[in-house]
Regions:
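N-terminal binding-site loop/beta-alpha segment at the start of enzyme catalytic domains
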Residues: 2-87, 145, 151
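A general structural detector for well-ordered alpha-helical segments in enzyme core domains, enriched
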Residues: 10, 44-48, 71-78, 107-111, ...
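Conserved, mostly hydrophobic/aromatic
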Residues: 14, 26, 45, 52, ...
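A short, flexible beta-alpha/helix-coil linker loop
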Residues: 29-34, 96, 128-131
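Structured C-terminal cap/extension of enzyme domains
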Residues: 53, 58, 77, 174-175, ...
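Short catalytic-loop micro-motif centered on adjacent basic/acidic residues
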Residues: 59-65, 156-160, 183-184, 255-257
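A short, structured active-site edge motif that brings together acidic residues
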Residues: 85-97, 123-126
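Glycine/proline-rich, positively charged
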Residues: 98-216, 224-227, 234-235, 249
């Protein structure tokens, strides 16, 4: 337990590694950017990362692909001046970039140069699904290279992040005996989605640590519809508080990752993390979550989790924000809210759905297999 300014961060077992990590981890997928720009505000981002570390967060999660590679660079800078020794550093290998057996070592070396480190504590194969598993991991003997990197000290622990169904998750877990941990998409809306609760339980039984990504479902669970907010108000709880506690309540969860873009966001999550514990949910809160689940099930239009893997459109369509605009129609039961979001976050800065040429490149890499081109052409009609 770490205390700073009255804040106490709880630590949890990281599978069978013997390591304890903070219940709250700092994700770098959405570091703050300059207005109307794709460039990270490095000074602000470094301040945020170091502030979280100073207040007890000891798990920093980044990836080769986050924010076009900028996230790893900024993370490395944030860990200078003694901060590297205070944290466990996690990053991910972009398996989709592998085209031969040499690419693993080349890309890992590039990542280590970006972050200016000689070792990565937790290294994951990023976004595994059946396609990447067969056509990248197995085809190019990636597991052999991964284990060699562990043996020679470039990485300490081996894992994977996941974007497919439970059967594929189980297959990957069972295929290789050297997995130390995994990272899955889980929140109170998506209990049966991808690996889901079954995946959490299965990994726990195998002694693997389990990190959670998308605890707030890309912000959807932070800005709940009025009907859900009323339910939470009745038990004097905030939406983010409920979403995080839902996960910390579960024994198999090692660390809940949050992309924190402001000091306010960090402080809020720290306050929730300091009271986190297994089995913490009361009966009233469990019932409130069940009601919230039903509300979302009845209102969603597209099962997009905002992973941003499609945000490299050849026509520069800002696909995630366009999809978010569509989902706001159902979640908030309001075309007005959806149009205001679209006008302010898409039309104003460029990347409109109307620029879609139906090339379907985005659909080939979407982990959720969304018919994106269909929705891009439908969006203007939905919000007019």
């Amino acid at each position: 337990m770490f205390k700073c300014g009255g804040v106490e961060v709880q630590y949890r077992n990281f599978g069978n590694t013997g390591i304890k990590v903070s219940a709250l981890g700092f994700g770098t997928m959405r570091l703050p950017m300059f207005p109307n720009s794709n460039t990270i505000d490095q000074e602000k981002s470094i301040e945020l990362i170091r502030y979280a570390i100073d207040n007890g967060v000891n798990y920093i999660d980044t990836a080769y692909s986050y924010q076009d590679g900028q996230a790893e660079i900024v993370t490395g800078k944030a860990l200078k001046n003694g901060y590297r020794s205070k944290v466990y550093l996690a990053s991910k290998a972009p398996v989709w970039e592998y085209n031969n057996e040499y690419d693993f070592d080349r890309i890992l070396a590039e990542q280590m140069r970006r972050m200016n480190v000689n070792q990565i504590d937790f290294y994951m194969l990023h976004s595994l699904d059946a396609n990447f598993w067969d056509n990248k991991v197995l085809k190019y003997n990636v597991l052999e290279h991964l284990y060699k990197a562990k043996r020679d000290g470039r990485i300490r622990y081996i894992g994977f992040s996941f974007n497919d169904d439970f059967d594929m998750f189980k297959w990957i877990c069972d295929y290789w005996e050297h997995w130390d941990f995994c990272q899955i998409h889980l929140n109170y809306i998506d209990e049966e989605y991808q690996a889901g609760l079954r995946g959490l339980e299965y990994a726990k039984k195998k002694g693997m640590a389990v990190n959670i990504m998308e605890p707030l479902r890309s912000g959807y669970l932070a800005n709940v519809p009025k009907s859900t907010q009323i339910v939470f108000d009745e038990i004097c709880a905030k939406p983010v508080e409920i979403a995080m506690q839902y996960l910390w309540d579960k024994e198999g969860v090692s660390c809940v990752l949050s992309d924190m873009g402001s000091f306010e966001h960090i402080n809020q999550n720290l306050e929730y993390a300091k009271v986190s514990s297994i089995g913490m949910l009361s009966g009233k809160r469990i019932m409130a979550i069940k009601k919230a689940q039903q509300t979302y099930i009845n209102s969603r239009m597209i099962h997009c989790n905002g992973c941003y893997k499609c945000n490299c459109c050849p026509q520069h369509v800002m696909i995630p924000r366009n999809l978010e605009a569509i989902n706001k129609i159902g979640i908030h039961n309001s075309v007005k809210i959806a149009k205001e979001f679209y006008d302010g976050s898409v039309a104003l800065v460029g990347g409109s759905a109307t620029d879609c040429t139906n090339c379907k490149w985005c659909e080939s890499i979407c982990p959720q297999h969304i018919n994106i081109s269909h929705w891009m052409h439908k969006l203007p009609e939905l919000i007019k």
